[in-house]
């Protein structure tokens, strides 16, 4: 089934060229089906690039998904046209009285910034708190995972000395967990972060189900028992060249970044990178939509109730 997005959203043309089924709002309105409502809080600077990446992963599901885009505040963006934000993004005040099946909170380039120094930290806390009573399942990605763990478990920020960048091997720990259905025992996924997610630390200080870890990258995937909060510390949504673009950017800014691990053939940045994580990313999002959202959400979102959710796996 397709994703439903505004007809004029730039991502629509990109996805159609990839033979991804994008349904127009007009056609979707004629179907007698209750689509899933998914809200994306986009915290990344290059919003058009990021929204396209997430929409691509949401499209690979038998479920019809209505996607709405949310911005954290009304400050002008240096990397996204104001017209685009005005046309396709909503303010929190416009959605706070509604319920959603799913919420995705993207990463943000704030790895070395303390939470209290993030200009929109209080607003982000408000949205995360709101999600508890208005969203069936929330997916926290990269920096958002660290922010979510701070809000839900009051975990302090832990930072690596060197940035983690590259494509890392991971192994699964609960093969029968719904979020892991269809996963290989070992899989690859990209990381680009300073945050440190130690399996031992999370196991000691939270009751999370730790689903996948890496010897080098730490915890990659974890969920609360009720699957209403899913934490992904990497970037399964990344395009093949995203890590490359970040590497070139950091070089241009006079930094001395390490070459992303297991990314360029022969570790040579002159060689085009190979996307070895694409199938994993699609499966992860498909499982989240099916088992954490669709199987748990009420048919009538107007009668949303936290007590209605089962905690069975």
From Swiss-Prot:
One of its GO terms (cellular component) is cytoplasm. It is an enzyme of class 2 (transferase). One of its GO terms (biological process) is L-methionine biosynthetic process from homoserine via O-succinyl-L-homoserine and cystathionine. The active site is at residues 142, 235, 237. It catalyses: L-homoserine + succinyl-CoA = O-succinyl-L-homoserine + CoA. The record marks 111 as: Important for acyl-CoA specificity. Its main location: cytoplasm. Pathway: Amino-acid biosynthesis; L-methionine biosynthesis via de novo pathway; O-succinyl-L-homoserine from L-homoserine: step 1/1. The record marks 192 as: Important for substrate specificity. It comes from the Bacteria. It is found in: Cytoplasm. Keywords: Acyltransferase, Amino-acid biosynthesis, Cytoplasm, Methionine biosynthesis, Transferase. Its EC number is 2.3.1.46. CDD domains: GATase1_HTS. Substrate binds at residues 163, 192, 249. GO terms for molecular function: homoserine O-acetyltransferase activity; homoserine O-succinyltransferase activity. InterPro entries: Class_I_gatase-like, HST_MetA, MetA_family. Transfers a succinyl group from succinyl-CoA to L-homoserine, forming succinyl-L-homoserine. Belongs to the MetA family. PANTHER family: HOMOSERINE O-SUCCINYLTRANSFERASE. This is Homoserine O-succinyltransferase. It comes from Vibrio vulnificus (strain CMCP6). The gene is metAS.
